Structure formats: structure tokens, C-alpha cells
Amino acid sequence: MKIGLLCSDDWANFQYSIQKSLEAIGVDCVSYKLQRHLFSYDNQCDVITVPRISEAYSGCDVILLCHSDWEFIQYLPEKSIKINFATGTKYRQSYEFINSKFSAPITIIALPEFQTLAPNPKYLVGAIESDWAVKDVVGRRIRVGHFPSNPDVKGTEDIVRILRNAENCEFIYSTERVSHAENLKRIYDCDIYVEMLASTQGGKPYGSFGITGLEAAAMGKIVITQAINDNGLYNDTYGVNMLNFVKDELGLKKTLSSLLQYKGDYLTGQMESTKEWMEKNHSYKATGLKLMSYINGL
């Protein structure tokens, strides 16, 4: 079976992580996007032009339109199964219209909030692997970080207001846009990473952990984030979850306060367990196997 992946903009380098996941288990995969990412990822999907799409995907049996980019269906082989891979804002704002463009028996969703919007949803979290070693926090002050890709939608103003004067830790944050590699370095300098605190976007439910939270977890950071409308979907799909989900400001305060009460050796153990959890559930191989279990079930 030959699998195709296609999108216009590969937000958060998500499609590339799925490409790597399929390649990790030996699946024949075609993966392109229309333009380079503004975050300057060291590695990302190759770029294609629209006139080349039909030929490039002519041999694909199943094609995932990542980020709900339904517009490319017209260029794809009629015999192929075309699946919506719903990942974010585009689907959130126009899910009914986008659903009408796909006839595949499943929808792959990257966010739990989409489980009530998508026909026959199959949940798949992005894949992240990291060579960064877990930092030992014994005998030193805990560092809490926040480096949003988009402060306006990550709840940065509220996060900074809440954590600026937090006790028993050092809070560091920046809204400066840097390269992806530089951002990973900033995150690695933290022990606890606060990804987001925002329950709505454009009047729609919002607030589900993203790639940055997973990148932090893959380094062994303790991550505080959100999973609005999860309703047990993560645990049902993957089992134990090592992310710390909060619903609101009070939840953020309580979770951080609870974590900071522990001694350094306990926190180091939690960080090691978080990295092991990522390697088990969200490595390239694990993600590729889960995706193919969905596709093979068609």
C-alpha cells in the first residue's frame, strides 16, 4: 500500500512528523507541501507546485489531506481514498463544510475537541523524538517556562499574570519569534513548561495540547497544558497520560503549586517518566503503527 500526505502550509511541522512515522515502519510514502515553514525547521516536507500534484500522487492508494486541505482533492487520482486529517483552526471554524468534501469512512483528528465534530473520528497525536537528556533538578531552583508560537491564542497574557510572581520557582518567558532550533534550546533550559491557557478561539472551543507541549515532554519536561473536551479520549486511545491538563486559571495555580511542593529527586523521576512515556506512545514508530491500524481497518 502506498500512502500520500499533502498540505499547503504544514503547521507545526505536523505532516512531516507523520511522514517520518510512516517511514519508520517501512511504509511507501509520498509527502509534499506547497511552501516552506516560517519557523525554519531544520527538516520539513519537500515543496511541490500544483501542476506536479497529479503525477506525484498517481500511485497512492490512500491520501491524507493534512490540516483539512480539501482544495487539493480535484488534483488527486479518483480511485484513491482521500482522508481528512483535521489538526486545527481551519477545521474548527468550518468543520461542517469540510466534512462535506470528504467521503472516506474515517476522519483522523489530532485534537480531542474534534471528536464530536468529525464523522467516525480516529485520534492520532503527533510524533516527536528527542535526543535531549533529562536534566537533574536536585538541589536547585525550579525553572518554569513559556515560549508561545502565537501569544494571542495561547493565553500568554493570563499565564504571565499568574506566574510572574509565583513562589518557589523562577519564571522565564519570551514572545520573541526565533528559529525552531533556538526555541527548543529555550524549552530545554526549563524544568516545567506551561504550553497554553485558552479555552476558546474565535468563539469556538479551543485549548488542546499541541506539538510544542509534546516537544517539551520528549525532552523530559513536566508539561502543563490543556485538553478541552477530551472526555477521556486520550486515555481510551493511548492509556496513561503524563501531561498535566488544566481547565482554567485556578487549575494552573493548583497544579503548579502542587508540583513545586515536591523535592528535586521526585521531579527528576517525573521528568524521566515523561520522556519514557513519549518514547512509548509518541515515537515515530509508535505513531506510524497506530496510523496504519486505522488505515488497514478501512
Briefly describe each language-model feature range:
Residues 264-296:
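A charged, aromatic-enriched C-terminal amphipathic alpha-helix characteristic of glycosyltransferases
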Residues 84, 89-91, 103-135:
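Donor nucleotide-sugar binding/catalytic pocket of nucleotide-sugar-dependent glycosyltransferases
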Residues 126-181:
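Conserved catalytic-core segment of nucleotide-activated headgroup transferases in glycan assembly
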Residues 218, 222-226:
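Short hydrophobic beta-strand element within catalytic cores of glycosyltransferases
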Residues 184, 211-218:
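Short alpha-helical segment that forms part of, or immediately flanks, the ligand-binding pocket
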Residues 16, 32-104, 109:
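Extended catalytic core of nucleotide-activated donor transferases of GT-like folds
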Residues 196-212, 225-237:
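Nucleotide-sugar-dependent
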